[in-house]
Each structure stands twice: as structure tokens, then as C-alpha cells.
């Protein structure tokens, strides 16, 4: 019997290499035990940096003694996109990666928040280099994450994303719901992102002479009258998996044929077999 080749997975994030979310993701991947894990993540938090990278100032890369067993780990004094660029162009230029994961982010990345998210920015960068990738985010707070059965689900997500062959490398944006009443997650849903987004309200924190300092961390939801599939899935306690598009087309989206092929592939995969029918919930 032929032994299945272990995947080579790069893990990054935007909350920083010491964040709880990336540690949780690594523990789940280690539990599933199907891949060799490499970590290249920012030394400090980089939330909201989108696809920004260090164009002028040098970026430092140094080995990092990660507390869990991984093949190798490095910390970067830059953004998640810096991490991906350094991984692809320097660290693994002679030994290609199979997949790049970003997360698990502390807070959701859905709707139009994708334009701001550095968690998602890393995935778009991976796709531009021809590498399949997945962004993973936990709504509200990483404390809401439910570990039961998630190691096998994340393995299925990874294997599906690597195996998916169509026109471009696949990028998935996965969001886990926040179950404030501790009710178990119901399954996973293939969705499309909508127009919902978080906007920051300027808050004056101090004044020094003529200079005023503000924060934009007070985030509020703005929801359109017609809820998106992604929004409804999360609201109904389902994990959402939405495709990301990195190619530059006039529509800046998947064609109807590409979307139908991807949706059909997803629904027939091991992911969908483990999920529940959402038609009544999302009608």
C-alpha cells in the first residue's frame, strides 16, 4: 500500500507569533498528524495591515523557539505578507510548500472586512504565488473556539484545498461562529461573502500641543438589509467557508462556471458529508 505523502504547511497570522490562535491551530494540526509544520509569523501584532509589506525599511527574520513541536519557526519584524514573501522567496525557494494557513485570527474576517484583514492578506499573497491557502478566523474572540472534532475538520479543509484543481490555486476564508450560549456548532457551509463590515469609530485618547491622538479600535457592525450567505451561516451557528479571489478580472470575481465547479466540488467532498443541511436555516 502506498503511503500518503505528508503535506508541507506554512503557518502565519496577523496577531503575532505568540498569539493563542496560532498556538491553537498548531495543536490541532499536530493532533491530526498529516503534515510537516513550518511557522513564519510576525513578532508583533499586525491586525488591519491588509496586504501591506515592507517596501523601504529592511525586515528582520530570526529563528524562534516555538513552544510546540514544529519543523522550524521564524519570527519576522514585519507584516503577514512579509512573512509569506520571505518564506516563498528565501526560506523555501528550493523546497516548495503545499499549503499556507493564516490564523486562527482573534475575531471574524467576513464581508468587506476582507479588504482590511492581514490574516486574509497573507492568503491572497500565497495565491498570487500559485500556492493554495486558507484563512481561519474565530468570531468575537478565540475563547469561543470549540475544539471537538476540529482537528479532523481542519485536516479535511487542508486536503480539499490542496487537491482542488481548476484554473487558479484555491483560497478559502473560513470563519468559526461565536456560540455565546455554548451550543455546539452545527456543521460547515460553503458560502459567498457579503457587504457586511466593521467600521472603527474615532476615539480621542490624548492631545499633545496641536497634535491629537485617536484610536479606531471601537468597532461596530454595519449590515445591509439583505443578509449574505456568510453572515447567515455564522448567525445560525455554522462554520462558513467562502472562496477568495486574487486574480484581476473585470468582474474581480469567479465566473459562474468557476463558482459552480468549486461549489460542487466542496459539497461532494469529505467536508460536506460531515455537515448538516442548511436549507431550512438559511431560507
Swiss-Prot record:
<feature type="binding site">
    <location>
        <position position="15"/>
    </location>
    <ligand>
        <name>a divalent metal cation</name>
    </ligand>
</feature>
<dbReference type="Pfam" id="PF01975">
    <property type="entry name" value="SurE"/>
</dbReference>
<dbReference type="GO" id="GO:0008254">
    <property type="term" value="F:3'-nucleotidase activity"/>
</dbReference>
<dbReference type="InterPro" id="IPR002828">
    <property type="entry name" value="SurE-like_Pase/nucleotidase"/>
</dbReference>
<dbReference type="GO" id="GO:0004309">
    <property type="term" value="F:exopolyphosphatase activity"/>
</dbReference>
<feature type="binding site">
    <location>
        <position position="47"/>
    </location>
    <ligand>
        <name>a divalent metal cation</name>
    </ligand>
</feature>
<keyword id="KW-0963">Cytoplasm</keyword>
<comment type="function">
    <text>Nucleotidase that shows phosphatase activity on nucleoside 5'-monophosphates.</text>
</comment>
<dbReference type="GO" id="GO:0000166">
    <property type="term" value="F:nucleotide binding"/>
</dbReference>
<keyword id="KW-0378">Hydrolase</keyword>
<comment type="similarity">
    <text>Belongs to the SurE nucleotidase family.</text>
</comment>
<dbReference type="GO" id="GO:0008253">
    <property type="term" value="F:5'-nucleotidase activity"/>
</dbReference>
<dbReference type="InterPro" id="IPR030048">
    <property type="entry name" value="SurE"/>
</dbReference>
<keyword id="KW-0547">Nucleotide-binding</keyword>
<dbReference type="GO" id="GO:0005737">
    <property type="term" value="C:cytoplasm"/>
</dbReference>
<protein>
    <recommendedName>
        <fullName>5'-nucleotidase SurE</fullName>
        <ecNumber>3.1.3.5</ecNumber>
    </recommendedName>
</protein>
<dbReference type="GO" id="GO:0046872">
    <property type="term" value="F:metal ion binding"/>
</dbReference>
<feature type="binding site">
    <location>
        <position position="14"/>
    </location>
    <ligand>
        <name>a divalent metal cation</name>
    </ligand>
</feature>
<dbReference type="InterPro" id="IPR036523">
    <property type="entry name" value="SurE-like_sf"/>
</dbReference>
<keyword id="KW-0479">Metal-binding</keyword>
<feature type="binding site">
    <location>
        <position position="105"/>
    </location>
    <ligand>
        <name>a divalent metal cation</name>
    </ligand>
</feature>
